[in-house]
Regions:
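Non-catalytic signal-transmission and effector/linker regions of two-component phosphorelay proteins
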Residues: 1-14, 78-79, 83-84, 101-102, ...
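Acidic, metal-coordinating helix/loop segments flanking the phosphotransfer/catalytic sites
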Residues: 14, 27, 39-57, 62-65, ...
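Conserved acidic carboxylate
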Residues: 17
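Acidic phosphotransfer microenvironment of two-component signaling modules
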Residues: 20, 41-45, 119
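The feature encodes the CheY-like receiver
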Residues: 23, 65-67, 96
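Charged docking surfaces used in two-component/phosphorelay signaling
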Residues: 24-32
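Short amphipathic alpha-helix used as the core "switch/output" element in two-component signaling
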Residues: 48, 69-84
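Hydrophobic/aromatic residues positioned on beta-strands within the core alpha/beta folds
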Residues: 91-92
Length: 133
């Protein structure tokens, strides 16, 4: 049924974003490109979802409510699901912040700066996670 025989369902992507408008846009873009999106507004909830579910990739805002930010989500993934750490994309409107810059240097994870062009965002996602379909 699939070309490669390795995919039977759309790639599940965990989306961590607390701004409703950005969440809606990113979710719509990912879904229109064939990804199955599981959204959450907080880093703490993201960790609960990661503990109980498998994901093909993660798109995470750097700053999230719930006491757990994007850097902490990445650290958990790197420790517990290292294969997933290579498929995480950060999004942030605070790229000039030194803490954000240090996290990006330390992790090597790609980051798309908000506001972003949809084409630029999905290009980074597909380069990082592969195409969904």
């Amino acid at each position: 049924m699939t070309q490669t025989g390795t995919k039977s369902a759309p790639a599940r992507v965990l989306l961590i974003e607390d701004e409703p408008a950005v969440m809606a846009l990113v979710r719509a873009v990912l879904e229109s490109h064939g990804y199955n999106v599981v959204p959450t507004e907080s880093g703490a909830e993201a960790l609960r979802l990661l503990e109980k579910n498998d994901f093909h990739g993660v798109v995470s805002d750097m700053r999230t409510p719930g006491g757990v930010d994007g850097a902490q989500v990445y650290a958990w993934i790197a420790q517990h699901r290292p294969e997933l750490a290579r498929r995480l994309v950060f999004i942030t409107g605070d790229i000039a912040n030194e803490e954000t810059a240090a996290t990006l240097r330390r992790t090597g994870a790609p980051c798309v700066e908000k506001p972003f062009r949809v084409h630029d965002f999905i290009t980074v996602v597909e380069q990082t996670m592969g195409r969904a379909a």
